[in-house]
Regions:
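Carbohydrate transferase catalytic cores enriched for Leloir-type hexosyltransferases
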Residues: 1-389
C-alpha cells in the first residue's frame, strides 16, 4: 500500500505537539511496516522546507512543494482547483492527515483528531484558530473521512456525543513517548543542562504554552497559597512559549509575594526537557482540557510525581500513578502540593508515585501508536473494498 502523509506541521519554526506526533508516527510506521511505501508531503517556501527533518528509512519518499502555504491554501479553495495528490509523482492509495489542515483530495483519507477544545471551550481558542477551522470545514472533513484516528478515549467520546461520529469509524491511537530520551535514570548531561537555567536545587515544574486553556494562573495562585501556608521553599519553574492572553498571568506573578522564587524560562530546546523533568520534585499541570496531554506523559516517563486534572483525557494517561485534582478549584492544587512535599510522608509518596508513573508510561510508545494506525487503515480500507464488490 502506498500511504501519503501530510507533514506540513513539521515545517513550523518551533515543534508543536502535532509536530511531535507526526514525526514519531512517520518514523514508527516506516519501521513497523516495511512492506508499505510512505510518501510524505510538505509545502512552503524554500526556507520553510529546510526545516524538515531527515528520514532515513528506505520506504519513505518526501515530496517538497516549493510553494508558499498561503498560495497553496488559495489554490485548494478554488472551485476545480488541484487535489493534493496531483503534486505527488505517483497516486497513493490513501492519505493520513495528522491534524485539521486545509486539503482537497479525491482519495480515501484518515484524519487524526487531537481534541475538540475549539468547540468545548471556545473562549480558550484564538480568533485565528477559529477562522482556520471555519475555512478548513472541520465538520465536513470529519464526515467525509474514511476513518478517524482519535488520540484518546476522551476525544473519541467527544466525537461521538458532540458530532455524532459513528463508533465504528473511530480508532483510538494513543500518543507515545520516546523511552530512550524520557527516562527516569539521571543522565551525565542533566546537571549541565539544568545549570544553563541556574537550576541547582529541587523545584516545582510547570511546562506549558502560556495560554488560558493551560490554567497556569491556578499554578501561580496555588503556589502562592502553598508558600503562604508554610509549604516547602521550593522555587516554581515555568517553562513554555508565550501564547496569548498572558496579561493576567504576568500580573499574578508580578504581584506575588514570592515572585523572586518564580522563574520563567520561556521556550527551551526539546533536548533540555528531560533534564528539567528529572530535576523536579513534582510536575504540575492543571489544564482545563486536553485531547491527550503529552507533557504529563513525558514527566511520568522521567519518574516525576504528577499533579494534573481529573478532566478530559488526563485520567486515561495518569491512572492511579499521580494526583488528580479539580482544575477549577485552586485549593485542590494547594492540597496536592502539601501532600507531595509533606516533610514526613511526602518523600515516600514521591518515591511511590514516581515509580508508578515511570512504569505506567511504558504502556505508551510510538510503536503502539503506529500499530493502532496500521490496524485502523487495514480494517477500514478492507471494509471499504468489500463493500465495493
Amino acid at each position: 500500500m502506498r500511504i501519503a502523509i501530510d507533514i506540513r506541521s513539521l515545517t513550523d519554526e518551533r515543534m508543536t505537539g502535532v509536530g511531535v506526533y507526526t514525526l514519531n508516527l512517520v518514523t514508527a510506521l516506516a519501521e513497523l511496516a516495511p512492506q508499505h511505501e510512505f510518501v510524505l508531503f510538505a509545502s512552503g517556501s524554500r526556507g520553510v522546507l529546510e526545516r524538515l527533518p531527515n528520514f532515513k528509512a528506505s520506504n519513505i519518499k518526501i515530496v517538497r512543494l516549493n510553494l508558499p502555504n498561503r498560495l497553496l491554501f488559495l489554490l485548494l479553495k478554488l472551485p476545480g482547483g488541484p487535489k493534493l495528490e496531483s503534486f505527488l509523482p505517483e497516486r497513493p492509495d490513501v492519505w493520513i492527515f495528522p491534524k485539521f489542515n486545509l486539503f482537497k483530495t479525491a482519495l480515501p483519507y484518515f484524519l487524526t483528531v487531537h481534541d475538540l477544545a475549539f468547540e468545548i471551550f471556545p473562549q480558550f481558542v484564538t480568533f485565528k484558530e477559529q477562522l482556520h477551522n471555519l475555512l478548513v470545514g472541520v465538520h465536513q472533513v470529519t464526515d467525509q473521512a474514511q476513518g478517524i484516528l482519535a488520540v484518546s478515549e476522551s476525544t473519541a467520546a467527544d466525537l461521538r456525543t458532540r458530532w455524532g461520529v459513528e463508533a465504528d469509524k473511530i480508532s483510538i491511537t494513543p500518543l507515545g513517548v520516546d523511552g530512550q530520551l524520557f527516562q527516569a535514570r539521571e543522565q551525565p548531561s542533566d546537571k549541565a543542562y539544568r545549570a544553563t537555567y541556574d537550576l541547582n536545587r529541587p523545584y516545582i515544574l510547570a511546562l506549558a504554552t502560556q495560554e488560558p486553556r493551560k490554567n497556569l494562573e491556578s499554578v501561580i495562585e496555588g503556589y502562592e497559597l502553598f508558600r503562604a501556608q508554610g509549604g516547602e521553599t521550593l522555587p516554581l519553574v515555568l517553562v513554555g512559549a508565550q501564547g496569548w492572553k498572558t496579561g493576567a498571568l504576568k500580573e499574578l506573578i508580578e504581584r506575588s509575594a514570592f515572585k523572586n522564587d518564580i522563574l520563567e524560562l520561556g521556550y527551551i530546546p526539546d533536548k533540555h526537557k528531560p533534564a528539567l523533568y528529572r530535576g523536579a520534585t513534582v510536575f504540575v499541570w492543571p489544564s482545563f482540557y486536553e485531547g491527550f496531554g503529552l507533557p504529563v506523559l513525558e514527566a511520568m516517563a522521567c519518574g516525576v510525581p504528577v499533579i494534573t486534572s481529573a478532566t478530559s483525557s488526563l485520567p486515561e494517561i495518569v491512572g492511579t500513578a499521580g494526583l488528580l485534582i479539580d482544575p477549577f478549584n485552586v485549593n485542590d492544587v494547594v492540597s496536592a502540593l502539601h501532600q507531595i512535599t509533606e516533610p514526613q510522608r511526602g518523600a515516600d509518596l514521591r518515591k511511590q508515585l514516581g515509580a508508578q508513573a515511570s512504569m505506567r508510561a511504558q504502556n505508551f510508545n510510538w510503536r503502539h501508536t503506529a500499530q493502532a494506525t496500521i490496524a485502523a487503515l487495514n480494517k477500514l480500507t478492507s471494509t471499504s473494498s468489500n463493500g465495493n464488490k
